[in-house]
Amino acid sequence: MTKVVVCALYKFVSLPHFESIRAPLLAMMEQAEIKGTLLLASEGINGTVAGTQEAIEALLVWLNSQNGLDNIVHKLSFDDEMPFYRTKVKLKNEIVTMGVEGIDPLKVVGTYVKPQDWNALISDPDVILVDTRNDYEVQIGTFKNAVNPVTETFREFPEYVKQNLDPAKHKKVAMFCTGGIRCEKSTAYLKEQGFDEVYHLEGGILKYLEEVKAEESLWEGECFVFDNRVAVNHDLKKGQYDQCNACRMPITEVEKQSPAYVQGVSCPHCIDKISDEQRKRFVERERQVNLAKARNEAHIGSDVNQVIEARREKKEAQRRLAAEKNNAKKSQVL
């Protein structure tokens, strides 16, 4: 069986022309049958995609040929099945949303620590270790003795810092996240707030799991990932968690045995939080998902609106590509 290559990538770089990159990038991904989502902003590129090895290699070559997008930080893992349903390239204000203006990792950032040096750093009693990820990610796995800020989104992280960290008291701060991108901004933010010794795990948790042997590892549990695998274990293979299609929270097989769990409708995490109207909508969505699956029109997890959206985006990408080729021909004639 041919393995699907999953590629997580990002790069902070000044991209004043980022809007013009979207159409050719989307067209390239669709032609190579790459699925997943990439975000473009004036500060760079970020996302996770999947495809055949040849397709992912072609994407990296294409990106490397674009002005400013060479030498992109990327990490590869493998899966037996395609972990994404659609192909998207989105234009954003930030490639990772902290919501604080003026934070620029290109100007100031924390000290990068290689995975093989990470254990020694976080074993230092003078170092406070902070997990910059969201609470639902931390719950299924984190580093030994790491502090959980209990945030629901990355936007809440600056407030956590203001309320809980002090440059005069916390002399050494080490931080980590899934692939490294959130720490680019979190360490830049701490440096701007006057913290002196600020460190972050280069390549994030995924790089650590790839390079550090399990018997030497200080990682505990699994690592949440933003695709249909939900989580990966220390071997970077799909873990034991599933995901509630209603609230998107990771759930265990034990939780799926709960009366609160209804496929696509509710789980123990959200049963008391969703309204009757939401429940009706989720039931209908699940019905449409099953109908689409029976017609072989979409994978599980897609509803009719998403199928329509995917079709429209593909047609729009084809239209833009055709228009660009036509304009190029006219320019040659002139």
From Swiss-Prot:
Pfam families: Rhodanese, UPF0176_N. The keyword tRNA processing applies. The keyword tRNA processing applies. The active site is at residue 177. PROSITE patterns: RHODANESE_3. Its EC number is 1.14.-.-. It is an enzyme of class 1 (oxidoreductase). Keywords: Oxidoreductase, tRNA processing. SUPFAM superfamilies: Rhodanese/Cell cycle control phosphatase (SSF52821). GO terms for molecular function: oxidoreductase activity, acting on paired donors, with incorporation or reduction of molecular oxygen. It catalyses: uridine(34) in tRNA + AH2 + O2 = 5-hydroxyuridine(34) in tRNA + A + H2O. One of its GO terms (biological process) is tRNA modification. Residues 123-217 form the Rhodanese domain. CDD domains: RHOD_YceA. Catalyzes oxygen-dependent 5-hydroxyuridine (ho5U) modification at position 34 in tRNAs. Belongs to the TrhO family. This is tRNA uridine(34) hydroxylase. It comes from Shewanella baltica (strain OS155 / ATCC BAA-1091). The gene is trhO.
